[in-house]
């Protein structure tokens, strides 16, 4: 895609033309857990792998149309994740929950504020956590140069629009912590889920593409699904294709691990783009 150089009066920034004619494009910016892959101090085959699909930054994603760009979570690898991406305005930043691996890169959205304030959406608990953890971003008189963020508290099932994309929050449980997944038409994005209440399931009817967390093959975890649980959940809601994210090095080498999954279930990897 050809890029054009434009000069902003306040900042010199590189812009990219929108994604004309491509519909919605979903990019996996990161597919790893809080440790990422490779894991510091680990010398397993996955952590030593030269296959880029085995290298996983912290979980984050990008949903784009020709007119709109939405980022889901801004973890500590956000700057590195966005460097290969065209420089476009961020129309909305959706936060799933307050844990550091999902919000640690909030400050790195600053360059995008040259293109306009960024609207940030999260549940009330996460909004309070953001104000506490990043107070300099949300004061009445912010220091010059801090990110220009407008914080919005959102509720499960209450739809809203970001540009031309309709967003519906879905509540899931991260252990004992209520967090948000998001539905965009026939696409659902859910990470860090362990369980979901039955009353949430009707809001996932008709999902064709599911992105959902799957920590590892075995050894039960108190707040994350295993791969088997993620597949069971996919079957329960009737998704046509499922991409697993928030993965540890314990899944094994991508090339080999993928062969163990059903034909309609895929291990996502950093940089993977899908059309939805």
PLM feature segments, named:
Residues 2-9, 15-190, 199, 256-276:
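Binuclear metal-dependent hydrolase catalytic cores
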Residues 11-12, 228:
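Hydrophobic residues within membrane-embedded alpha helices
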Residues 195-276:
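Cap/insert and terminal regions of metallo-dependent hydrolase folds
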